[in-house]
Amino acid sequence: MPGLLLGDEAPNFEADTTQGGIRFHDFLGDSWGILFSHPRDFTPVCTTELGRAAKLAPEFSKRNVKMIALSIDSVPDHLAWSKDINAYNGDQPVEKLPFPIIADKDRELAVKLGMLDPDERDKDGMPLTARVVFIFGPDKKLKLSILYPATTGRNFDEILRVVDSLQLTAYKKVATPVDWKCGDSVMVVPTLPDEEAKKLFPKGVFTKDLPSGKKYLRYTPQPE
């Protein structure tokens, strides 16, 4: 099945959305971007997901991240459903979210991007879109891909955490360890020699002693 692999450039597709027609590369501009699909409008898990995405939209915006959703529903359905999403969030039930939703009624994009879930089908037996998350860098290349089944809602706080890690590690020679969150210490990448690490990280590099005697667990406070 067609799809995207890490490092692939995003296709410069055209699409109809709740905010008008777009060309994807123009939409992204020089920003980071998150493209996320959901199975259907007017369904319970999807409503909670897009509600949380809407609540976190200001945080993504602070990080220069543009968000755009996608499903096989029509633009009128997306707009009507937006009222329910806003009401779920306790906001005014208006036909507007802080990000556009793509109407991929013929499944053309879902097929091209590998977003279909073979186990979830509509009343006509056609596959629905899965819960996919693609994160693109300013170079339009895929930096992260996550695929969830229809039964499991996504954690958008985790997606925000991943963005923090991707942006930090894109510009600094560090990696983020398990359960890392912004402000925690990070790991110095193994390919960086000790002397260069000391120059790059003036706050200090701390190496954990290990039974193997190898010096690969090197920590440093998160660089600015």
Curated annotation (Swiss-Prot):
Residues 30-39 are annotated as: Required and sufficient for targeting to lysosomes and lamellar bodies. The active site is at C46, D139. The modification Phosphotyrosine is found at Y88. It holds the Pfam family AhpC-TSA. Keywords: Antioxidant, Cytoplasm, Hydrolase, Lipid degradation, Lipid metabolism, Lysosome, Multifunctional enzyme, Oxidoreductase, Peroxidase, Phosphoprotein, Redox-active center, Transferase. It catalyses: a hydroperoxide + 2 glutathione = an alcohol + glutathione disulfide + H2O; a 1,2-diacyl-sn-glycero-3-phosphocholine + H2O = a 1-acyl-sn-glycero-3-phosphocholine + a fatty acid + H(+); a 1-acyl-sn-glycero-3-phosphocholine + an acyl-CoA = a 1,2-diacyl-sn-glycero-3-phosphocholine + CoA; 1-hexadecanoyl-sn-glycero-3-phosphocholine + hexadecanoyl-CoA = 1,2-dihexadecanoyl-sn-glycero-3-phosphocholine + CoA. The record marks S31 as: Important for phospholipase activity. GO terms for cellular component: cytosol; extracellular space; lysosome. Belongs to the peroxiredoxin family. Prx6 subfamily. This is Peroxiredoxin-6. It comes from Gallus gallus. The lineage of its organism: Eukaryota, Metazoa, Chordata, Craniata, Vertebrata. The gene is PRDX6.
